[in-house]
Amino acid sequence: MLITIISAEHSLRSKWVREYFASKGYEVKMISVNTSSVHSFFAKIHFLKQLRKSLDALSPNLIYCGATIDFLMRELTVYKNKNNNVKLVFDVCDDIHVDQKYLNQADYIFCASESCRAYTHGAQVLYSTNGQSCLNTSPELSKEELFFCLIGNKNIDMNFCVSFLRECSILKQCTLHILGDWKLKESFIQSVLSVGVNVIDHKDLDSQSTRQDVYDQCHYGLNLMDFEGINSESLEYMCGQIPIINSIEGDLSQFCKLWDIGKNIDAQNYKIVASNICAESLDVQLNRRLHMRNLYKTYFTKDKFFETLDEIGGSL
């Protein structure tokens, strides 16, 4: 059986979808879509021409599409109608609205979150994974000082991070550990230093165990981004079992409330949150680390990802 996976470039999920089908003994072929380069009419025509050529040559038994762009979904439903034996799976990977009439043509629908499922009728939630397992953790948290961790990302709300850290530093000595690089990092570091917060820049730490050593020193990860959904940084915080200060709406916000894995924060309450975490006990923070570990193992492991994909079995 031949599986063709169509995914956006830099997809969090396609690697694991491919590994899943390969583990079942299926032949897997990948088609990648650069979603940022197919906006113009002529770019779409060119891409669809190449796609038709590839699908005709491959003649797949199942198409798994994780790039849910309307024009692409429309093309795949046309292909399915012309090839009755092919099975079609749509995976709505982003919290974006897609045309339900195309989704209805699929044999199976996945979506990336509960908030996404609210407008994706008939979908099963398939949470992303980073493929890692939680390591043993030995937190060594200071009572006198607050330590934060920030994973570098172009979507970081840097001004909000600085504002929040300023409030915390008024009440308690603070240090920010930074992992990774992004374009404006040096400017951001200077802004953080200017509000009286110490900075330790680890740059890129490739080893999971080395990153865990950093997380074990930190009270909270700063998940403050101009982003919707669960991204790789959120998964890294979860796997690292570090509670989060979170500004991302949707499922993460709900997890913070229901699983007590951290604090939701916005422009209205960030001063209150800063005051609360500066006053809370280490027991509260240690319990949140346990909650984060349990949450990750419940929803975000590779085993759980594969288990959810098993539900396609009836469509094959």
What are these regions (language model features)?
Residues 14, 47, 62-83, 96-98:
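An aromatic- and histidine-rich active-site surface loop
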Residues 186-209:
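Nucleotide-activated donor-binding/catalytic signature segment of Leloir-type glycosyltransferases, i.e.
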Residues 4, 53-72, 86-89:
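Short N-terminal targeting/anchoring amphipathic segment
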Residues 268-273, 282-316:
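A charged, aromatic-enriched C-terminal amphipathic alpha-helix characteristic of glycosyltransferases
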Residues 213-229, 242:
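Acidic donor-binding loop of glycosyltransferase active sites
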Residues 1-35, 108, 166-171:
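N-terminal subdomain of nucleotide-sugar transferases
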Residues 32, 97, 104-137, 151-152:
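Donor nucleotide-sugar binding/catalytic pocket of nucleotide-sugar-dependent glycosyltransferases
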Residues 110, 139-169, 177:
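Conserved donor-binding/catalytic core segment of Leloir-type glycosyltransferases
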